[in-house]
Swiss-Prot record:
Subcellular location: Mitochondrion inner membrane
Keywords assigned: Electron transport, Membrane, Mitochondrion, Mitochondrion inner membrane, NAD, Respiratory chain, Translocase, Transmembrane, Transmembrane helix, Transport, Ubiquinone
Function, in words: Core subunit of the mitochondrial membrane respiratory chain NADH dehydrogenase (Complex I) that is believed to belong to the minimal assembly required for catalysis. Complex I functions in the transfer of electrons from NADH to the respiratory chain. The immediate electron acceptor for the enzyme is believed to be ubiquinone.
Name of encoding gene: ND1
GO cellular component, as recorded: mitochondrial inner membrane
Residues annotated as transmembrane: 2-22, 69-89, 103-123, 138-158, 172-192, 224-244
Broad EC category: translocase
The protein, known as: NADH-ubiquinone oxidoreductase chain 1
InterPro entries: NADH_UbQ_OxRdtase_su1/FPO, NADH_UbQ_OxRdtase_su1_CS
Single GO molecular function: NADH dehydrogenase (ubiquinone) activity
Topology in the lipid bilayer: Multi-pass membrane protein
Keyword Nucleus in annotation: no
Length: 261
């Protein structure tokens, strides 16, 4: 179980790092600029250089901040993000544990991450961080209500909150054909949830103050930075599980469960 946990964390971290590089490449293409092109072949190892810089950078704790909670909040947020992937979203066997109420479990973890964001701004003792933390937390919690109502309707149709039930229900007919217009609204809400353009309300690229992470740097800033991309990747997987046939398309790769604990 310990080995599987370590492998899972490494695989997810590498996927998230690749997503960060892909997003930067796409943004540079849209904005007609070069983008990352120095480290590795055409900049493909840029995420390794960024990670090395962040992990070797020192951490300064503000004099008025609570040192314990200042360090604990990003650590808790990082733990919440990794806990997402211990659920059975990979497949029936490729998970550390399986719970009957997978959708509820994911929603609770998402709400907990929003609380971490709010408390992060509060314990920084910076008025800009406090305002940004409240703004981000209120936005995330309000969106969770909408997502909860939407997924509740879908779960009533499937008569279960389990990812396995969604896989069985969609063996013949995908739910995307029933909830196409609803999915378009969900995608807009997900953009709001993960603070992606044009809904980057909690933190805009044009602002000098980086929201609730204003006082953070180095390793602790990297945890929040990865947390946003964890949400982005997890919500993408969640949409695939709920609307696009679950893990039925991954059946050729399910032989890997023989090599897991």
């Amino acid at each position: 179980m310990l080995i599987y946990s370590i492998v899972l964390m490494l695989v997810v971290t590498l996927i998230i790092a690749s997503i960060t590089l892909l997003e930067r490449k796409l943004l540079s293409l849209v904005q007609r600029r070069v983008g990352p092109n120095f480290v590795g072949y055409k900049g493909r190892l840029q995420y390794l250089a960024d990670a090395l810089k962040l992990f070797l950078k020192g951490v300064a704790i503000p004099s008025g901040a609570n040192s314990f909670f200042f360090v604990a909040m990003p650590s808790l947020a990082g733990a919440v993000c990794y806990t997402f992937w211990m659920n059975s979203i990979w497949g029936p066997s490729l998970s550390m544990f399986d719970v009957e109420y997978n959708i509820v479990y994911a929603s609770l973890l998402s709400i907990l991450f929003g609380l971490c964001v709010m408390l992060t701004g509060y314990f920084s003792k910076n008025k800009y961080s406090v305002m940004a933390g409240l703004r981000a937390a209120i936005l995330m919690l309000n969106l969770e209500i909408f997502l909860g109502i939407v997924f509740l309707n879908v779960c009533f149709l499937v008569e279960s909150f389990s990812f396995a039930a969604f896989a069985v229900y969609q063996e013949i007919f995908w739910l995307i054909f029933l909830f196409f217009f609803l999915l378009s609204n969900i995608l807009l809400v997900f953009l709001l949830e993960v603070n992606r353009t044009p809904f980057d309300l909690a933190e805009a690229e044009s602002e000098l103050v980086t929201g609730y992470t204003t006082e953070y740097g180095g390793f602790y800033f990297a945890l929040f930075y990865l947390g946003e991309y964890f949400h982005l990747f997890f919500f993408s997987c969640l949409i695939s599980v709920v609307f696009f046939g679950s893990w039925e398309l991954l059946k050729p790769f399910l032989f890997l469960h023989n090599y897991t604990v």
